[in-house]
Amino acid sequence: MCRGLSAVLILLVSLSAQLHVVVGEEAPKPEKEICGLKVGRLLDSVKGWLSVSQQEKCPLNKYCENKIQADQYNLVPLTCIRWRSLNPASPTGSLGGKDVVSKIDAAMSNFKTLFEPMKADLAKLEEEVKRQVLDAWKALEPLQKEVYRSTLASGRIERAVFYSFMEMGDNVKLDNYFQPANVEELLKYAWALPMHKKQRSMYDLIGQLVQSSKSPMLQTLHAVELATVVNPELENRENLLNDQVVQLRDNLYKNSFATLVSIARHFPDHFDTLRQRLFKLPDGSKPGADTLPNIVNFIAQLPSDELRLSSVDLLLQSLTAENGTLVQDPEYVYRLSQLAHAMPSLVDVKAHPDLQQSVDDLMAKFNTPIDGKTLQYFQNIGISPSSSVAT
């Protein structure tokens, strides 16, 4: 390998020397001429012009003419014309085009002659370089995969997407590498993937992880993302989310809503999708009267006044009849009175005065007369359902 490299260096030095002879390099002259005029004389003229200008203090914005300087300046091109007419074939010291080409051809022929004996060594050198490069890539490949997986597991999504492009094949091999604890990072990564097939493979892997985790929250997050991502490769995703919503609603009716509250606090975008479906019941159905206290307890646990207000609005929509009034079934009277009584504690209008009008509009829905009773009646019922019967 060293022998081949030395040979290449010798050839380059030889070619450089020959080209140096071809192009030539004129030795500096003690006094150069321009059109037969000494350069020094021209420089002295320029210095004289500058000196006179400084002495006369000619303003920059004013034209100042000096006849002697003008004559000297105009004499230069006339001198060049006269000199060229007297020296039409004066050599310039440089080779003609044909001479340069012939010299280069000769130099290249000499180079080719020197190169022939070294072809075998250069071929060996090329093979050795290829082998070392391939060895380096083989050593780099597992390291690259490890960096890719570690960046993905740590939540550095942009870098993980970059490394995914460097992986071979359409499917990213991540099986048996991640745990359910990595699901949140994997969901962010899957959402960012631009290729539909890779995205589908990643969601399939996440689905396996969330099923093995037995975690309702992870299963819900996975179902919400599948239902909202734009990918024609994904199938049966609406059914998956609908099944998840049915399970969450049943748990809510049974006063078990920790998963929903956790999603509302940590994943507000996912919760917004869930909430719309949670309160939207099939036509002709509504929450049972006995489930309303549990639903109100759930709403009270939501993290913001705006979220609690809009959730109460969605609940009342599910309890609104076709004529725009609240249900008038007797079993809902006391439960609705509890909700009306709890409204001031659900939304703090003193801290959020901008919500006052929305609260007033919502409270107006309770003015629907039920069995001849108004909003004020329901707010004054108290905590005992028997009081509504006695009245």
Curated annotation (Swiss-Prot):
One of its GO terms (cellular component) is extracellular region. Induction: (Microbial infection) Up-regulated in female salivary gland following infection with P.berghei sporozoites. Female salivary gland (at protein level). Female saliva (at protein level). Not detected in female midgut, head and carcass (at protein level). Not detected in male tissues (at protein level). It comes from the Eukaryota. The keyword Transmembrane helix does not apply. Keywords: Behavior, Glycoprotein, Secreted, Signal. Residues 1-24 form the signal peptide. Glycans are attached at N323. Disruption phenotype: RNAi-mediated knockdown results in increased TNF-alpha/TNF levels at the bite sites in the host. Its main location: secreted. It is found in: Secreted. Mice that received antiserum against the protein show a decreased parasite burden in the liver after exposure to P.berghei-infected or P.falciparum-infected mosquitoes. Antibodies against the protein are not generally elicited by natural mosquito bites; however, active immunization of mice leads to productive antibody response. Active immunization of mice with the protein results in reduced parasite burden in the liver and reduced parasitemia after exposure to P.berghei-infected mosquitoes. Antiserum against the protein decreases P.berghei sporozoite motility in the murine skin. Required for efficient probing on a mammalian host. Alters the local inflammatory response in the host skin following a mosquito bite by suppressing TNF-alpha/TNF expression. This is Salivary protein TRIO. It comes from Anopheles gambiae (African malaria mosquito).
